């Protein structure tokens, strides 16, 4: 049971408390439900207002770039009815997440607290006291036998770069739809900073929506681009063309020079090169304010 008043006398016990309602949290719930009976109680907490994790916040034109049947909780099947090669849209992924949650609710007694931010937990023999805060600021206290922190990478939306001016407008795909009116009424060149999935999806959306418009992409030296049609062809072509996964992973491994770079969101970083003495990750600058998980600097708040 969750109590809004921590001093309340009666507290109902949950078997499991799961923090995070994304793909990690849903898989944790699915596994836990396999060990519990229908009358046992489970509670789910997430800071977002619905199930879906990072997919709730991400840009509207995102696609799931993998066979969608494999992106699920446990062995819960999709109800989309599309070919396995179909690249699921944001809404289709969110609908499947909701379907997974509905299936789990048939297996156990599930209580959900969306819009609640996890704050801390305290363990005692046979019990975990979890403290969270609702979206309106009220304290939320939950007691459970087990706690599963399944918030994954705890990804937050990207803020625009701080470089806007009268002639340059900086936007973030997470807050500005590249297919929206603001972009449509402009005819200037577009510069996409980054070479990951977000950058490639954004460049693809711009090229598709505005044929002939100048689109530039700035990527770092470690960026590796592939052609999906050549690497993972669809239909009968996949029987005699494409690349074996073992060959792909071998090529990627050979491109790695052994250098590891740790970086937080404020930009502080540390590079570990081959042959260098091992140092703890807490040797990042003491001024770092961006911790998300250990091991990190004691004063780093957003990794």
List each language-model region with its residue ranges:
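Dinucleotide-binding/catalytic capping subdomain of oxidoreductase cores
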Residues: 207-303
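Conserved Rossmann-like nucleotide-cofactor binding loop
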Residues: 24, 50, 154, 198, ...
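Feature captures the FAD/FMN-dependent oxidoreductase FAD-binding
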Residues: 83-156, 292-295
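Glycine-rich dinucleotide-binding loop and its adjacent helix/turn
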Residues: 2-4, 83-84, 89-96, 151-216
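Short hydrophobic core segments
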Residues: 17-19, 140-155, 190-193, 302-303
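Glycine-rich FAD pyrophosphate-binding loop
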Residues: 33-58, 213-226
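Conserved N-terminal glycine-rich FAD pyrophosphate-binding loop of Rossmann-like flavoproteins
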Residues: 49-74, 225-243
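N-terminal Rossmann-like FAD-binding beta1-loop-alpha1 element of flavoenzymes
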Residues: 11-44, 191-209
